[in-house]
Amino acid sequence: MPSLYLASGSPRRRELLTQIGVPFTVLSTQIDETPFDLETPAAYVERLALGKAQAGLAALPADQQACVLGADTAVVLDGRILGKPVDQADALAMLAALSGREHQVLTAVALTDRQRSETCVVTSRVRFRPIQPHEAHAYWTSGEPADKAGGYAIQGLAAIFVAGLHGSYSAVVGLPLCETAELLSRFGIPCWQCLEGDKS
């Protein structure tokens, strides 16, 4: 069985991959995340997920039997990608734009080894209730929005803003577990290898 590497610094992706009982090692990768002109959000997240996985594989010894998993998430409103806020004003503007509306969250997963690469993109729809200005300010003060796509974390304090979700909750957090498990199985990596409470 090949060794699995996660090409992501995201603690949320580490937690999600651990949740399905797959042993892995974290790889630190850096790629250019600038969108291409006229690139669709789906093509963007797929390109970045694959780029992270390929960069991770390139950092490993050439004779090592390994699979590398990469992922990328984008929050999309009216066809526009909302990245990580650059400052308080940017974060408050994002929350105001998302307030009382439905938006899309696209997460791409890529898995690559020495022979092949496979990807998938999962689209979910999230609906926010109206967010009051004082709530947006308090949320920014918490520090949570600073490094989050779209300026919020559905699994954190921003859960109180979520009036509805259609799609994959784990994908909105950062890694669609159903689709990730399917990809892993196609590369010969089963889930549930590390089960909590397993005494064997």
Swiss-Prot record:
GO terms of molecular function: dTTP diphosphatase activity; UTP diphosphatase activity
InterPro entries reported for this sequence: ITPase-like_fam, Maf-like
Cofactor requirement: a divalent metal cation
Family annotation (Pfam families): Maf
Transcription recorded as keyword: no
Subcellular location: Cytoplasm
Record protein name field: dTTP/UTP pyrophosphatase
Species in which this protein is naturally found: Pseudomonas syringae pv. tomato (strain ATCC BAA-871 / DC3000)
